[in-house]
Amino acid sequence: LTEGMHGMISQVEGLAKALELDFFHEKIELNSFWKFVPPKFTPIKKFVFKNIIEKDFDVIISCGRKSVIPSIFFKKNSQKRIFNIHIQNPKISLKNFDFVVAPEHDDLKGENVISTKGALHYLTMQEIDENRSYLEGKINKKKDIIILILGGPTKYYKYTKDNIQKIYTSLNENINKKNLQLIVIPSMRTPVETIKLAKEYFGPDHLIIDNVDKKAYLSALSLAKFIVVTCDSSSMISEASLTGKPIYVAQISSSKNDYRFKRFRDLFKELNIIKELNDNLENWSYQSLDETNRVAQEIKKKLS
């Protein structure tokens, strides 16, 4: 159960795959008034949401605020024992769930809480390696590859032309200094103008992917020597950390207090996974981070 956003789908489906479950995905829709009410003030009643699930199920994996009440409702009203797992802080009594999976930077404590370094996701190294050839024919094999993974505007980070140009300028200095080729990978949130500006700025010698393309994303992760991710997406930074390759974070000035994102990035800096994008690229390595499988093993152990 999710609100349908990529970062949430990646987490629930990643955990379902790691638990070796057959699954179906349900995008939760709350009825008008309840969209604006925090879970702790919402009744656990059917009139809160629109979804009707007729398929049989044994486990619920939910992520995001809107899926909290439906998860509890379906568990309580089932004719059989249902295990429910919520990803992220549900901001309601943790006793409503069998497991709550939350990042360390949320600082959530409880007997049924499993803390993670960063976000869960659905990528595997096997899948990344299998898709390497997808972009291989479009790159200059004599050059090392640097990739830029773009997020998109949020209430904390604005994708203004000025903010994006600063990132492109910093990237360009590194590209010229080290004679690199760039691959730009957009996400669902990336504005069209940001991609258009990349094409104008970097020109035909670099590869700018126009649309969301999972195969291109996986291929780029495989081909990259250096990875750059915009600071607005903890999910994409977590996904990139599976590779064990150097990850640089492209900063955007925050328009609101982004302390949770900063805590996440500080943790990843301590783990030697990320550094801030500057004009001097270094090569380093770290222990590949695969929290999805670690969490799945912990859940399996507790369930058995």
Please place each PLM-identified region on the residue numbering:
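A donor-sugar binding/catalytic signature common to diverse glycosyltransferases
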Residues: E3-M8, Y217-D258
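Leloir-type glycosyltransferase catalytic cores
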Residues: R265-S304
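Short internal beta-strands
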Residues: E26-K27, V101-A102, L182-M188, Y248
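Active-site and donor-binding regions of nucleotide-sugar-utilizing enzymes
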Residues: M5-H121, I128
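A nucleotide-sugar donor-handling region in carbohydrate enzymes
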Residues: L94-T160, L277, N283-L289, N293
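Conserved catalytic-core segment of nucleotide-activated headgroup transferases in glycan assembly
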Residues: P153-I185
